[in-house]
């Protein structure tokens, strides 16, 4: 997998902004089959920073109803990446 295929987009919410400011942790939506080692290498290659720790969260698809029709939401995987103290990532909130 290419490093740009692993990291899909940053997740920007109030909770992730709190993690970023207080603990220097950044949250990304990643490819569902990516592991922690691949995520670490991808973040280090794309943003040129040193990664200390990676935690992943798998979100299973949820069955929803729209009228009589049932459908499933898409499964997602998020990675919370902790950077070294001297490193930061700047990204646009429009991404």
UniProtKB/Swiss-Prot annotation:
PANTHER family: 60S RIBOSOMAL PROTEIN L23A (PTHR11620). GO terms for cellular component: cytosolic large ribosomal subunit. Keywords: Ribonucleoprotein, Ribosomal protein, RNA-binding, rRNA-binding. One of its GO terms (biological process) is translation. The lineage of its organism: Bacteria, Fusobacteriati, Fusobacteriota, Fusobacteriia, Fusobacteriales. This is Large ribosomal subunit protein uL23. Part of the 50S ribosomal subunit. Contacts protein L29, and trigger factor when it is bound to the ribosome. Transmembrane segments: none annotated. GO terms for molecular function: rRNA binding; structural constituent of ribosome. The gene is rplW. One of the early assembly proteins it binds 23S rRNA. One of the proteins that surrounds the polypeptide exit tunnel on the outside of the ribosome. Forms the main docking site for trigger factor binding to the ribosome. Belongs to the universal ribosomal protein uL23 family.
């Amino acid at each position: 997998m290419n490093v740009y295929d692993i990291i899909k987009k940053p997740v920007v919410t109030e909770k992730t902004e709190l993690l970023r400011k207080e603990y220097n942790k950044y949250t990304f939506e990643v490819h569902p089959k990516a592991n922690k080692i691949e995520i670490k290498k991808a973040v280090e290659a794309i943003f040129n920073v040193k990664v200390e720790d990676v935690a992943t969260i798998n979100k299973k698809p949820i069955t929803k109803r729209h009228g009589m029709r049932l459908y499933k939401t898409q499964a997602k995987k998020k990675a919370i990446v902790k950077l070294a103290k001297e490193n930061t990532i700047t990204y646009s909130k429009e991404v």
